[in-house]
Amino acid sequence: KVAVIISSFAQEMAISIKQHNGFALKFVGDAVIGYFIDVSTLLAADKAIECAKNMIAIMEKGINPILNEYDYPPLYIKVGLDFGMNMIVRYGSDKQKSHVDILGPAMNMAAKVQNMAKPQQILIGADVYKKIHPATQKNFKKKTLSEARWKYRYRDSGKLYPIYEYVS
């Protein structure tokens, strides 16, 4: 039964990513890693935000009510997003059997941002915040974190890299 739940979760998250013009790169345990590219970086950032909101709605309105019917505990997701250059890498020479991965500072930062999120929370890095539409920016609040909890800095200035919380 647990395998069916995890499989259903992964399938729903992958569908949501695809519906928002993203790509589901891989599934790691109960985590889904997706990425968004577009002709316009602004559009890609907004699509990623919409996808994150949709994923939480899927959990709250789709998956968890079904789990509740069978007396299973609810599942919660934590979303972390960042923006920047990454590199897509293929491990192996056989196109059918090789593994594809995405590497780079933005992927690393997205994982760190996600690690700071609470269940059913969307957190984004400053580089995403700068790219999203001003109307969407109004739904985010800069998160105050102690340097003991959040140590990540801009490489060029050394200033603390801000993260923002979705509040609306």
Residue ranges and their predicted role:
Residues 1-11, 26:
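Conserved long alpha-helical elements within nucleotide-processing catalytic cores of c-di-GMP signaling
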Residues 20-44, 64-103:
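Catalytic core of nucleotidyl cyclases, primarily class III adenylyl/guanylyl cyclases
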